[in-house]
C-alpha cells in the first residue's frame, strides 16, 4: 500500500517494484494464494509453484485454479490445502473481509503518495509490528502479528 493506503488504480498495481515481486515470490512459493476475481484477471494466469484460489460469485471454472464462491467456502481439508500457508492477495474487498481472520500480515509500504481507486483497510488496531523485514528508499516490507485479545 502507498502512504495514502492506495493498493490499486484501474485494476492495476500503480507501481513497479521488482524487488517486492521477488520477495513475494520467495515468500509464497509452495503455498496458497487466495484472491478475488478482479485481482486474478489483472494477473492473467495462475502463478507457478503455488495453489491459486479465486473467490468469485460469478466465475466458472478457470484452468489451473480453484474457484470458490467466498471465504466461508475455504476448507483446507476439503480443498487439498492442509499444511500450507494461505496468503490473501487482494483486492480491497477481500482484504476487508479476511483481515479479521488473519494471524499475520505481511505488508509492503510504498514510501510515496499514489493516486488510485482501491485502498487497503485499516489494520492498526488489530495488528502490531513484529518485524521490519526489508527497508529501502522506495518501500518497506513489514511483518505484523494480530494483537493478543
Where are the regions that the model predicts?
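Enzymes that bind and transform nitrogen-containing heteroaromatic metabolites
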Residues: 1-149
Amino acid at each position: 500500500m502507498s502512504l495514502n493506503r492506495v493498493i490499486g488504480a484501474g485494476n492495476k498495481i500503480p507501481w513497479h517494484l521488482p524487488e517486492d515481486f521477488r520477495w513475494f515470490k520467495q515468500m509464497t512459493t509452495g503455498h496458497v494464494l487466495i484472491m478475488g476475481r478482479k485481482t486474478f484477471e489483472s494477473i492473467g494466469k495462475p502463478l507457478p509453484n503455488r495453489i491459486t484460489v479465486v473467490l468469485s460469485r460469478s466465475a466458472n471454472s478457470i484452468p489451473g485454479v480453484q474457484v470458490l464462491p467466498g471465504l466461508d467456502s475455504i476448507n483446507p481439508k476439503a480443498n487439498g490445502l492442509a499444511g500450507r500457508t494461505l496468503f490473501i492477495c487482494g483486492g480491497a474487498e477481500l482484504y476487508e473481509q479476511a483481515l479479521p481472520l488473519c494471524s499475520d500480515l505481511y505488508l509492503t509500504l510504498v514510501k510515496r503518495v499514489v493516486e488510485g481507486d482501491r485502498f487497503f483497510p485499516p489494520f492498526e488496531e488489530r495488528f502490531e509490528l513484529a518485524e521490519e523485514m526489508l527497508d529501502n528508499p522506495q518501500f518497506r516490507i513489514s511483518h505484523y502479528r494480530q494483537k493478543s485479545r
